Amino acid sequence: LREVCGLTTEEIAQAFLAAAPTLAQRIVRAKAKIRDAHIPYQVPEPHELAERLDAVLRVIYLVFNEGYSASSGDSVTRVDLSGEAIRVGRLLVELLPDPEAIGLLALMLLQESRRTARTSPDGELVLLGEQDRSLWNRAQIAEGSALVERSLASRRVGPYAIQAAIAAVHANAASPESTDWSEIVGLYDVLMLLAPSPVIELNRAVAVAMRDGPAAGLALVEGLLERGELADYHLAHAARADLARRLGRTADARVAYERALALARQEPERRFLGRRLAELK
């Protein structure tokens, strides 16, 4: 991520939910290991590709994520990163058509299909439920959906394929109201078995809120925050704030919005959170 893809230490730290100094030390140790073990910089032999695939997929995924939602700066997205991740993802599928490589390409295309609708003409953040779906890229949705089916048909289902299936449910819903939230929660349940993480739990909690109401989702989000793993993750506090707001718990919502605003580093997100906070006041 640092030396090949050019992400900054701060961007990588954000991706791993780690402090930047901690991440910097990991990079120093990794460089020392490469140097001391005389690990060569060369293309792996064909028989070595499969065992290295997971790491390659992870790198492509994290580069795409930084392009899809920039961790800092003046723009919601970075098309240079997401475009490069999709390009490399296509090459990987051609080289090694593994179900998870196919699933990752599907996920990226389905997420990228919403790019134009995710910001207003003046660059402000537009949430999923408020997006103009006529702006979504139907060609990317069709290609991504076909790749999801291809990956799932292999019967070797992994976390990227499941995330792509979730994205396909969103992408193929005609409206926010017609979204099949029960299916999305069920897919998150599968994803939690395959690749459990606090961020996946948070996403599932938001889906539960959409299916069962904000009180059900808020209980899950607050439980996650109490565990401490997402204490410095601004989107967890933003989710808590939104659900509390929808329940009329204005004081709790205000505190959570203030915490999210203090942690957010992307300017459009900060402006969005600031507007929500001002509405409460």
Q: Which residue ranges define each predicted feature?
A:
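Amphipathic helix-loop-helix modules that constitute alpha-helical solenoid scaffolds
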Residues: E3, T8-E11, A18-D189
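"A position-specific structural signal for the A-helix of alpha-solenoid helical repeats
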Residues: L104, M108-Q111, Q163, A167, ...
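Structural signature of alpha-solenoid helical repeat scaffolds
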Residues: W136, R156, P176, M192-L193, ...
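Generic helix N-cap/helix-start motif at coil->alpha-helix transitions
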Residues: A195-E201, A231-A236
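Solenoid-like repeat scaffolds
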Residues: E94-L95, A153-S154, V190-L194, L225-L230, ...
